[in-house]
């Protein structure tokens, strides 16, 4: 049995951690549900950008849990391992959550990053999330067409080279594991993701 999994907003949900490195693993369970594991770390410069000189965390564990449960996930567990680190595990049992839709064909898992749905996530996000995402001035959320290099240059002109370099060096690592244990992985540059230039299927 094949499960086609379309990521529509999970990447946007966690984009505030992506100025460094984030890892997302999607594992198809024997019962057809999908287990999602996420770990991410906010970059130092981006953390300063959001929090200013405050030493507090930009991670609201209760709010993240609430939003994910509201999106249709089960068994949501969010842990905050410091000011900038977060780990999340959750389960999509219904196969009809806001994040995923599923289809049956043969025996592998597919991934598609869809920028239209990322924009939809932004439009439907709560005010606090939108304010954070607005700080990224990301083309994916404002509808502008821009290359990754142009976007990094824009960040540099607005926030300085340190923030721009942090985003430029950031990657999102995504792994899919089907019910037979076969694993596929892809590494996506953060700048490409935020420009909407990462519509990848594998």
Predicted regions and their residues:
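Residue-level signal for mature regions of secreted extracellular proteins and peptides
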Residues: 10-13
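Bacterial signal peptide processing site
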Residues: 21-23
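Positively charged n-region of N-terminal signal peptides that target proteins for export
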Residues: 1-4
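Post-signal peptide N-terminal segment of mature Sec-exported envelope proteins
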Residues: 28-45
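Post-signal-peptide N-terminal segment of Sec-exported extracytoplasmic proteins
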Residues: 41-71
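Mature, soluble, non-transmembrane domains
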Residues: 72-202
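C-terminal motif of bacterial Sec signal peptides marking the signal peptidase cleavage site
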Residues: 16-19
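Short, hydrophobic/aromatic beta-strand segments
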Residues: 36-39, 48-52, 98-101
């Amino acid at each position: 049995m094949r499960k086609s999994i379309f990521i529509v907003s999970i990447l946007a949900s966690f984009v505030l951690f992506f100025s460094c490195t984030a890892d997302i693993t999607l594992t198809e369970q024997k019962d057809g549900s999908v287990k999602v594991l996420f770990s991410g770390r906010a970059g130092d410069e981006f953390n300063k950008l959001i929090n200013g000189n405050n030493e507090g965390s930009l991670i609201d564990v209760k709010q993240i849990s609430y939003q994910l449960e509201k999106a249709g996930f089960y068994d949501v567990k969010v842990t905050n391992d410091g000011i900038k680190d977060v780990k999340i595990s959750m389960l999509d049992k219904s196969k009809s959550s806001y994040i995923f839709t599923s289809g049956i064909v043969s025996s592998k898992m597919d991934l598609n990053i869809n920028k239209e749905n990322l924009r939809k996530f932004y439009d439907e996000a709560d005010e606090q999330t939108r304010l954070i995402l607005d700080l990224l001035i990301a083309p994916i959320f404002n509808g502008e067409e821009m290359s990754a290099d142009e976007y990094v240059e824009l960040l540099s002109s607005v926030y300085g080279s340190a923030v721009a370099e942090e985003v430029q060096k950031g990657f999102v690592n995504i792994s899919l594991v089907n019910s037979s244990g076969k694993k596929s992985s892809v590494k996506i540059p953060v700048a490409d993701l935020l420009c909407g230039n990462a519509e990848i299927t594998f």
